[in-house]
């Protein structure tokens, strides 16, 4: 399976990523994060993503920190749009890592070689997961996807966004919810509201559906 992502979006070094998270007011002990980022940098390849475990920072605490330029003249004038979770996903934190996306038992870890999965546009999650695992890759979780957008907002582009199928919700009966989380840009319609046009959003798609503008994000592994 070939893997692609936006060639213009490059992750900064882990120490710079740590400073970005600190600047957002997310970190109780900045020096501890700096030390851990420095340690992880010696054990991971360039282009890796620094992530705080979702037990520390769940998706509901991160989504509103995403930012994208407002569309049109407003964006040219410096106006930005704040991220949000769609109104019919109040259970966003119930979407947890699956057996295909096992997280390290650490508050801070690294995702190696995250890719947006552009080559899987028009694939359903059900079709994409076997191809990912056959290629030795692991699907990104929602929290990992949000971290990626916090570090490199340009990874969410018009007509080139992505699903994070490493996160699923388990129903009380043990079955998996048929929704799968995704990150894309609001069109400002419906319950999103016109004021959110152009904003990065956490939403969901059906497990069996295909979308021409949504890739299936994956990684080489986690450390």
Q: At which residue positions do the language-model features occur?
A:
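A binding-site-centric feature that preferentially detects glycan-recognition modules on secreted/surface proteins
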Residues: 1-138, 145-223
